[in-house]
Structures are given as structure tokens and as C-alpha cells.
Amino acid sequence: MAGGVGSRFWPVSTQENPKQFHDMLGKGETLIQRTFGRINELVPEQNILIATNTRYEDLVLKQLTKTTKKQLLLEPAMRNTAPCILYAALKIYNENPDGVMLVAPSDHWIENEAEFIRNIKTSFEACACLLYTSDAADD
């Protein structure tokens, strides 16, 4: 998710160039680049979808140079977190009803990235054990 404005970080973060597109940590990468790199350790690059507002399409494509327009879930209006996650979930479900979704906000601080990756891998394994389909007829 990379659609918020980050108004608490004004004047660095603005509606035209919000915090996820800045190197807020002084690490040589913007927040969205760090998040994409972290998730790319878990998920093939082509399976990473970025939910953002239409106004940030060019910023995302400029900063995530290996990303294609097909990977962007462009929200026509900012409606906060829950609608963004629902939109992504519906998109994934329509492409793969058995797909597993990881929600990763682009502005989260992860202190121990190795532990974070291990925990996500464990969660993926748990989800794989839970996936099933049902042929049960409606009552």
C-alpha cells in the first residue's frame, strides 16, 4: 500500500510527493523501495501488486523501475486502509481464488528485517495448510 499523503510529516511529505516516495530513514532508498525490496525476498517480483492513488502512478513507476503498470492497483480516490485492502483482495481473488495476500504498508518501520521475513514465511506456510475449496451444494 502506497497511497497515503503522510500529512504528519509536512513539509517533507506533501500531497504531490508523500512520505513513501522519500528516503525518510537516510538509507539511500525511499520507503516504497525498501518495502518492495523486503517483499521481493518473499514473493516473485511479478506477483507484487502496489495499491496507490492514481496521482502517484508516475512516482511508483519511476521509483520501482522493474514494476509494470499491470502491477498497479490505482485507486481513483483516497479512501484509507480498509477500502484499499478490499480492492486489492478482490483483484487477487478474481485472478486466483486460492491466492494468498500479504498486506505491506510502504511506510512501516521494520527493526529486524530477518525476523520479519521468517515470520511472514511461517505465516505463508500456515495459510497454505488452511486453503481448501468446497463443492458443497447450497442448502
Each PLM stretch: what is its role?
Residues Y132-D139:
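Conserved small/polar residues in nucleotide/adenosyl-binding loops
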Residues M1-R8:
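Short, hydrophobic/glycine-enriched beta-strand segments
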Residues C127-L131:
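A glycine-rich helix N-cap at a beta->alpha junction
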Residues G4, K27, D138:
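Active-site beta-to-alpha loop of glycosyltransferases that engages the nucleotide-sugar donor
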Residues R8-P11, Q15, G26-P105, W109-I117, ...:
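Conserved N-terminal catalytic core of the sugar/cofactor nucleotidyltransferase
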